[in-house]
Amino acid sequence: MFGFSEGKRYNSFVGYYRRRYGERLQKLVLDAGFSCPNRDGTVGRGGCTYCDNAAFHPGYSTPGKPLLTQIDEGIEFQKVRYPRARHYLAYFQAYSNTYGPLDRLKALYEEVLSHPEVVGIVIGTRPDCVDEKKLDYLAGLASGRVLSGWLRSLRQAPGPTVQAPVPDTLTAPIVVVEYGIESCHDSTLRHINRGHSFECARKAVEMTAERGIDTGAHFILGLPGETREMLLDQCGLISSLPLRSVKFHQLQIVRGTVMEKEYAADPSAFYRPGLDEYLDFVIDILERLRPDLYIERVAGEVPPRFVNDTPWGLVRNFEILRLLDKRLEERDTWQGRLYSKPSSGQTS
């Protein structure tokens, strides 16, 4: 029936690094000062209609602050919440973190990998901000061909901050590319001013995965004009992508955005279920996804000061996960139960 780890009925990403490397690896969110091509006029202006990046990263991660300082402060921040964490992943999260010349990207990525407690990088970006040369470099980094002496230097790193030896199973820096795809529907992507198509996303994911780079994707549930049925229909397309992991976030209406004005003008254009309905909706999605796809997140949190309403109240992610486990058991269902190999193509 199902044989997922951690006693789950879905393929939870929780514990993935512990199983692979023998310890928990915590992410440190960084702001490296990037922008996006739909903000600076390259493919558009104003950015995505739902976006205010300040709502999505912690206080220690601020533009202009040196990256190694962000890492040190991030480690101190995370040690309060996760005191047993010993090594970290540098998470380039703000805006599009491959949007720049390759020489600049190399300098930034290799700078954070020089930190003695950082064992890998997670790069959040857009599918229209990668190319063959950038992906070849990342593949070389992940395989150990680039920075060939990195692991030896890390294991010999002096200093009181190093708490534990590097896992023996680690042979090169961990490299993950996480694409903001947001929707499989081109009409939605145009509506929210993304500036790229789903086919662009498909090609980027395929180019990344075929090089052996761990590849993830992010989707928003409830964008304007998308019905529950449309969101379920895209599960086949998501499963057809060579992704290792996926994140789902419910749409949150962030103050000061174009989408806040749009929502105020016509709330009926948005599918925004209450928490109870959302749990069933997420399960309906899980049932239709291929079972080997890791589920990294099923809901998002934004600090209350950034959102114009909180239909669920102040429910934390860990509580949502607890309720999800309970509901899966009540429905006696699991990830992939209704999965079938999708046909090729895309929705419009």
Model-derived regions: residue spans:
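Short, electropositive alpha-helical surface patch
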Residues: 106-110, 227-244, 301-324
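Core AdoMet radical
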Residues: 54-74, 82-102, 117-130, 148-151, ...
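Short Gly/Ser/Thr- and charged-rich N-terminal loops/segments
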Residues: 152-163, 171
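N-terminal [4Fe-4S]-dependent radical SAM core
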Residues: 1-89, 348
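Distinct, well-ordered alpha-helical segments
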Residues: 102-110, 131-142, 231
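Conserved C-terminal portion of the radical SAM core fold
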Residues: 199-259, 276-299
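Auxiliary Fe-S-binding modules of radical SAM enzymes
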Residues: 2-15, 21-26, 253-348
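Hydrophobic faces of well-ordered beta-strands that scaffold small-molecule active sites
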Residues: 26-30, 88-90, 121-123, 175-179, ...
